[in-house]
């Protein structure tokens, strides 16, 4: 299992980002500790690139998303 940190800047006021939030929640067990930050636990086959590419479908022009593996190397 791998933990990923997902952070974003959503630039479009009033835009409905429920698809983005649902896509993040569908990745696995999740926590939403800050307004634009999530931590998700995924299976070992998931990569940061896969997550980012999936989430980009729900972003508007100018929106940014950052995905990084934060699992320990143990």
Give each language-model segment a name.
Residues 27-74:
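Short, intrinsically disordered low-complexity segments
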Residues 1-32, 37-46:
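Extended, hydrophobic alpha-helical segments
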């Amino acid at each position: 299992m791998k933990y990923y940190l997902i952070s974003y800047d959503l630039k479009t006021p009033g835009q409905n980002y429920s698809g983005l939030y649902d896509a993040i929640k569908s990745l696995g067990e999740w926590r939403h500790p800050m307004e634009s930050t999530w931590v998700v636990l995924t299976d070992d086959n998931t990569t940061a690139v896969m997550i980012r590419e999936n989430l980009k479908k729900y972003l508007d022009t100018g929106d940014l998303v950052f995905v990084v593996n934060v699992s320990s190397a143990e």
